[in-house]
């Protein structure tokens, strides 16, 4: 094997026109890896810290020159000479070099860029696809896509409180078929919205963001779109929601303010509302149904719905093994959302997925609202046999890049490729 001989970072743009970090790693045997770092809109307070310059005269304060400098001047000298395939040692060196709990010194965006680029360089040098390098010969499960086709909340300027309404083509026989179903429903939804006189512009993640009258109208409209596309809701296609409740939670009164609905709810009332929605619609997954610090509320939600609905912790667990271990111990949730930039290194990401699986929790590999053409998360989903991926609508190249990579992987795996469909929800007791 060979050592790293050069590490170089630059400032580039993400899908929202904001700066982000791109890192390149070169090895002495000619291996090359490049990685771009994503960025979130609704972020959990326990996430690893993204370093931004704060200079209002450049990119409205969102520049990342400091993070780039940290890669080029602080990190590079430390990892040049290290064995490129020793991912765990390199990630440990990055964590120790930063020395903070939340990677706030060097920036999670600097650290993650290096961590991912190192893995790509190692795979390139070995002549292996990234998913195979990371997951070995047993990496063969294609994920069920969780496709965000209708947006509200922080991802849209409308009066829908729930941040994301998603479809999951669980009845497909292959990933290719699942993607086709999702794309057909997406186009069907556009036609349904147009016929109702709604705007069909798309939001950050490629989903539509019409000014619907209520959260339930969003669910009803998606059901109509699924049926008009020729599919059966509740059989071939299930619904999923990301409520992003921390955005609705008011710390002063400890209640949830659903401004679009014009109502204020307690934790108990939120749980009762979800129970009502689940009884009326084929909802199989709810993400961040309560505030990230409302552990009592999450426990109640898990007790009431955890046996039949996937309850995903995003802001709740922030891809962090300490937070996840606490959730497992308290019996909170039954699934974790995996975002590489919430924790900042590939090793820690894999640790979180492993911990989730051992506890019978599912792991949903996820994009961020500020994305790039980098498709690493597609490879991570297959490498870990996660079984689910959340990477937006089949619209906008930053989202489609991940889907296209999964199509390539499925082709490459041939007859050994597995698409689990509904069996991906091994956390449910149905």
UniProtKB/Swiss-Prot annotation:
Q: Which reaction does it catalyse?
A: (2R)-2-phosphoglycerate = phosphoenolpyruvate + H2O
Kindly state which keywords UniProt assigns to this record, in alphabetical order. Answer: Cytoplasm, Glycolysis, Lyase, Magnesium, Metal-binding, Secreted
Gene Ontology cellular component terms for the protein in this record: cell surface; extracellular region; phosphopyruvate hydratase complex
Q: Which GO terms describe its biological process?
A: glycolytic process
Task: Give the pathway annotation.
Answer: Carbohydrate degradation; glycolysis; pyruvate from D-glyceraldehyde 3-phosphate: step 4/5
Q: Which Gene3D superfamilies match?
A: Enolase-like C-terminal domain (3.20.20.120), Enolase-like, N-terminal domain (3.30.390.10)
**MF-aspect GO terms:** magnesium ion binding; phosphopyruvate hydratase activity
Q: According to the UniProt record, what class of enzyme is this? A: lyase
Q: Which positions bind Mg(2+)?
A: 242, 287, 314
- Does the record bear Cell inner membrane in its keywords? no
Q: What is its EC number?
A: 4.2.1.11
Which InterPro entries does UniProt cross-reference here? Enolase (IPR000941), Enolase-like_C_sf (IPR036849), Enolase-like_N (IPR029017), Enolase_C (IPR020810), Enolase_CS (IPR020809), Enolase_N (IPR020811)
User: How the cofactor binds, per note?
Assistant: Binds a second Mg(2+) ion via substrate during catalysis.
Chief location: cytoplasm
One family from Pfam that matches here is Enolase_C
Top-level taxonomic group = Bacteria
Cofactor(s), names only, from the UniProt record? Mg(2+)
Where, by residue number, does (2R)-2-phosphoglycerate bind? 163, 339, 368-369, 390
Active site as annotated:
205 (proton donor), 339 (proton acceptor)
Cited function: Catalyzes the reversible conversion of 2-phosphoglycerate (2-PG) into phosphoenolpyruvate (PEP). It is essential for the degradation of carbohydrates via glycolysis.
UniProt-listed PANTHER family: ENOLASE
Q: Which family does it belong to?
A: Belongs to the enolase family.
Q: What is this protein called?
A: Enolase
Protein's gene: eno
